[in-house]
Design a protein with these regions (language model features):
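N-terminal domain-onset segments
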Residues: 1-65, 75-80, 92, 180-184, ...
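Interaction-surface and assembly-scaffold signal
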Residues: 96-203
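Short beta-strand element of the conserved SAM-dependent methyltransferase core
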Residues: 15-21, 68-70, 165-169
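Aromatic- and glycine-enriched beta-alpha-beta binding-site module
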Residues: 51-122
């Protein structure tokens, strides 16, 4: 096995933007999830997040990532389903797919304090990131794994604050459904400490 067992302990910095989209504009959700989760609607629209993540040394793996995810619901509980995700680490790709059903693919990714780019037709300029308040962060991912819904807890703390990203997305690229759309907000989560996945059961 070329990747760590779960849970993964990760650290780094993340920039995330959030859009409100018509449900019809969403990327496809795996049909295997239809009996478990549904798209969460707020004012008749769906919330989509896209994030650049720099997983830095000090965690179980060090790599860069670009992802898009949709806010879902399971009854009254919120869930997150990742629809698109690229990493520059084969270990992260293989572990994400095998452990949690996260559809990771490989890409060339550049991420600095002022610029982000991925070889899938996605770029962003970064300005005005002001992390200042350390907050707890928690959510639950629901993905398709082996034809069934796989639910995975994610817990973190990070220094959070506003940021400004100008996204440049190719209209015919995999994130083209966000092309030309203005995000509602953008945040930075700096110096995050994340635990991704469930702890193994006690013997």
């Amino acid at each position: 096995m070329g990747y760590p067992p779960e849970p993964w302990s990760l650290r780094g910095r993340m920039y995330v933007s959030v859009w409100a989209l018509p449900v019809a504009a969403l990327p496809p959700i795996p049909p295997e999830l239809a009996s478990t989760v549904r798209v969460a609607r707020i004012g008749g629209r769906a919330l989509v997040g896209a994030a650049w993540v720099d997983y830095r040394p000090g965690g179980d793996l060090s790599y860069r990532e670009l992802l898009a995810a949709v806010l879902m619901r399971q009854g009254w509980r919120s869930r997150v389903t990742i629809t698109h995700i690229w990493v520059d680490s084969p270990a992260s790709r293989d572990g994400g797919r095998a452990l949690w059903g996260i559809p990771k693919d490989l890409a060339e990714i550049e991420l600095t304090d002022t610029r982000a780019a991925a070889s899938v037709g996605a770029e962003a300029t970064i300005r005005g990131a002001r992390p200042w308040l350390r907050l707890p962060i928690g959510f639950t991912c629901t993905q398709e794994l082996g034809g069934r819904a796989k639910t995975t807890p994610v817990r973190a703390t990070a220094r959070c604050g506003p940021a400004r990203l100008r996204w440049h997305l190719e209209p015919d690229g995999p994130l083209g459904f966000l092309h030309g759309r203005k995000p509602l907000l953008t945040l930075v989560a700096d110096d995050f400490r994340m635990r991704f996945g469930a702890a193994p059961p006690s013997p």
